[in-house]
Curated annotation (Swiss-Prot):
Its EC number is 3.6.5.3. This is Elongation factor Tu 1. GTP binds at residues 19-26, 81-85, 136-139. Pfam families: GTP_EFTU (PF00009), GTP_EFTU_D2 (PF03144), GTP_EFTU_D3 (PF03143). GTP hydrolase that promotes the GTP-dependent binding of aminoacyl-tRNA to the A-site of ribosomes during protein biosynthesis. CDD domains: EF_Tu, EFTU_II, EFTU_III. Mg(2+) binds at residue 26. Residues 174-176 are annotated as: G5. It comes from the Bacteria. Residues 60-64 are annotated as: G2.
């Protein structure tokens, strides 16, 4: 059978499997494709297909990630699965594979383990909006009470990280039974129940087009007789000719009007998410705008200097630092299109950060940057990437 033609008339959702090593994330991913393939909603993939995840680069960091796609009657899904724990940390922090929701896989035989906890914390820090739980390997637990105990433990753990532990759907089953097409009452029937829960519980993300206009400034030109043109790729939303917009970040915020939009040397009446455009700005001189600022819908985003972040620091082998760093470390933080120097403050209990660590830290920038929770950045020293991070909370 050739590659299935996916109808793009359904809402699209990005999802992933998270959880402790060997609890069955990859087996579950295979089980979903094998189960949905029966009704033509997927191409069946086995464990080995998914486990041999190709390398990709995101923000200068190499990550192994497997991508599969499938559909339910309600939606089309792109699903990511990572072979190693470090790949999950890097993936979630860089946003290489943006997740609109995740399936937390937890072995019923072991209950929550250290990486179960860490992945839930990461999901909270990087802003994964919703989780659904698959309690796997139920055939290895013959005591119903023990199963209920593990479920309670998972719910308490979710609640402790501010997820709605009491409301999150928990489906109990065996991914292996589904892959091997046996014991449907714990196998494929449970996979269908899981997908129904994912359909219902994980919200459809807002499309980039529906969000407020935002365009990072890449370049600025002065065109004689016409004014100042700012070029860049529209990240989200729509800008129409004649609309008032703001220039935010680095310097005090300025209001201006977009008096023209051009793409490929043609004049348009609007630019939208995904377009590489030149925007003509009224009454702004070439010195009034610089790379690293953003054009946006007025009031939709504000400039900040102090924030909390979750960061991953590259190992020496990944081309990162060879030595640890301490509080008052001063690297560059690369946001969208520019570097800004910032000062790092580590949590009280963290004396130093070693290459390969992921860490929560406070950063104070020397210039304000337009930011929201969830904004990704790279940490650089002299143009070389030494880490990646995501804004988890804005403080000032």
């Amino acid at each position: 059978m050739g590659k299935a033609k996916f109808e793009r008339n359904k809402p699209h959702v990005n999802i992933g499997t998270i959880g402790h090593v060997d609890h069955g994330k990859t087996t579950l991913t295979a089980a979903i494709t094998i189960t949905l393939a029966k009704t033509g909603g997927a191409t069946a993939k086995n464990y080995a297909d998914i486990d041999a995840a190709p390398e990709e680069k995101a923000r200068g960091i190499t990550i192994n990630t497997a991508h599969v796609e499938y559909e339910t009657p309600a939606r089309h899904y792109a699903h990511v699965d990572c072979p190693g724990h470090a790949d999950y940390v890097k993936n979630m922090i860089t946003g290489a594979a943006q997740m609109d929701g995740a399936i937390l896989v937890c072995s019923a035989a072991d209950g929550p383990m250290p990486q179960t906890r860490e992945h839930i914390l990461l999901a909270r820090q990087v802003g994964v909006p919703a989780l659904v739980v698959f309690l796997n390997k139920v055939d290895m637990v013959d005591d119903e009470e023990l199963l209920e105990l593990v479920e309670m433990e998972v719910r308490e753990l979710l609640s402790s990280y501010n997820f709605p532990g009491d409301d999150i759907p928990i489906i109990k089953g065996s991914a292996l039974a589904a892959v091997e097409d046996r014991n449907p009452e714990i196998g494929q029937e449970r996979i269908l129940e899981l997908m129904a829960a994912v359909d219902e519980y994980i919200p459809t993300p807002e499309r980039p087009l529906d969000k407020p206009f935002l365009m990072p400034v890449e370049d600025v030109f002065s065109i004689s007789g016409r004014g100042t043109v700012v070029t860049g790729r529209v990240e989200q939303g729509i800008v129409k000719v004649g609309e008032e917009i703001e220039i935010v970040g680095i310097r005090p915020t300025v209001k201006t009007t977009c008096t023209g939009v051009e793409m490929f040397r043609k004049l348009l009446d609007q630019g939208q998410a995904g377009d590489n455009i030149g925007a003509l700005l009224r009454g702004v001189d070439r010195e009034g705008v610089e790379r690293g600022q953003v054009l946006c819908k007025p009031g939709s985003i504000t400039p900040h200097t102090l924030f909390e972040a979750e960061a991953y620091i590259l190992t020496k082998e990944e081309g990162g630092r060879h030595t640890p760093f301490f509080t008052n470390y001063r690297p560059q933080f690369y946001f969208r299109t520019t570097d800004v120097t910032g000062i790092v403050k580590l949590p009280e209990d963290k004396e130093m950060v070693l290459p390969g660590d992921n860490v929560k830290m406070d950063v104070e920038l020397i210039n304000p940057i337009a930011m929201d929770k969830g904004l990704r950045f790279a940490i650089r020293e002299g143009g070389r990437t030494v880490g990646a991070g995501v804004v988890s909370e804005i403080k000032k």
